[in-house]
Amino acid sequence: MRVDGDTWDITSSVGATALGVAAARATETLRADALIRDPFAQILVDATGKATGWERLVAGDIDWPDPEAGRIYDRMVDYQATRTHFFDEYFLAAAAAGIRQVVILASGLDSRAYRLDWPAGTTVYEIDQPQVLKFKDSALAAHQPTAQRRGVAIDLREDWPAALRAAGFDSAQPTAWLAEGLLPYLPADAQDNLFRDIGVLSAAGSRVAVEGYEGKLVLDESEEEAVRREQVRAAFKTAIDVDVTIENLIYEDENRADPAEWLDAHGWSVTKTDAHDEMARLGRPVAEDVERGTFRGQLIQGELR
């Protein structure tokens, strides 16, 4: 369970979810019809220094004791590939519009500072826990970013705006912000504070992109559905020896603001794309039976009015 002031590295708590996301990007990269190409994802997964279940997943070396677990992983890869592609396009459009300052909030194992074709003069700020940034710095030490990359080692529940400014951030310049895979790991009030701080730090012409969710991440279910979910989770753990119980890491606050509505009410012109619709558009439709049992992601973009 989460507690105030908790911390983590890349193999524990919230940090472990970033490793799973990197594994999904690495898996996608190996597909013939890949939506994204991320050669750094495999490097990051391998850098854990041991033969992990995530490595076996990427290699396809998994004997699933329950086929449904493998199907869920495939769906996870499709979703991660879709949202990565969506936010890649967001950044490229921001760069084409002349934005040269980028902030990735809770960056985890994001590799965009290394793999996107940034215009000259672009600075990418990555904010995350100190141990997470330390791991990535070490794993990618032999590789050069395609923009000026600056790590900002701080928890987003602390005074991150001051740390960002200390790293060289210029609030007089337009910024492209990204909060991807972040909001459920923040309490509702911390989410409001995050958006408020983004607004204060944003100059005219700034843009923001957010991954939101329609309804609950952990859906209401019948007793039979709960039993089946636990069976699949056990199969996943048996296959890859990893147990990330998402319910213990997120905040399901009932008073959480809808991100698109909050941003629209605070000076941003917002567009919202349903993630399942985007998956279908990109040729990765969600099967009807899987769709009924999963949350619906919302891919949100805004431009400061």
UniProtKB/Swiss-Prot annotation:
GO annotation (BP), single: methylation
EC nos: 2.1.1.-
Protein origin, superkingdom: Bacteria
Keywords: Methyltransferase, S-adenosyl-L-methionine, Transferase
Matching Pfam families: LCM
Entry keyword S-adenosyl-L-methionine: yes
Residues reported to bind S-adenosyl-L-methionine: 128, 155-156
One Gene Ontology MF term: methyltransferase activity
Role noted for this protein: Exhibits S-adenosyl-L-methionine-dependent methyltransferase activity.
This protein's name: Putative S-adenosyl-L-methionine-dependent methyltransferase MAB_4607c
